[in-house]
Amino acid sequence: MPAQQITVATIVPVAPDRAWALYTNSNAVVRWNFASDDWHCPSARIDLQVGGTHKARMEAKDGSFGFDFEGTYAEVDAPRSLTLVLSDGRKSRTTFNPSTSGTTVETTFDADAENSVEMQRDGWQAILNNYKKLAEQSSAD
């Protein structure tokens, strides 16, 4: 049976090229890729090409827990969309669409079987909200 899909989205006040750069640059990813303030992303390595890898280390700041979020890029269409096949086989697809307010960034991903859909949606949305904050700061520069 196919995994249930979950979609999260935000609108960032920057053009698609800038939205793409903030989403795919390792130095930017470590600044937004965590779901709450007691977590962080100390490292990220991104080889942004089909067959390239994505690896982001996500950890609780107190050191109590951490994991590597890993996958392989199956599609890279800059600055429009990318698809990542996660290490457990699930897929995540993110699109960047121009809007009157900047860029709509939408991620649809396969839910995992271990956590509730609500928890997963809330976590991924919180991460996307952090991404939006960075984009807002970027637009003010």
Predicted features and spans:
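Hydrophobic ligand-binding cavity/cleft-lining segments
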Residues: M1-D38
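Short, surface-exposed coil-to-beta transition loops
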Residues: Q5-T7, G66-E70, G89-R93
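Generic structural detector for well-ordered beta-strands
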Residues: T7-P13, D47, R57, T72, ...
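Hydrophobic pocket/interface hotspot
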Residues: A19-W20, V29, H54-A56, Y73, ...
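Glycine-rich portal/gate segments that line the openings of hydrophobic small-molecule binding cavities
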Residues: C41-V85, T104
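Beta-strand/loop substructures that line and gate deep hydrophobic ligand-binding cavities in soluble
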Residues: R80-I127, Y131
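Short, highly charged C-terminal tails/helix-capping segments
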Residues: L134-D141
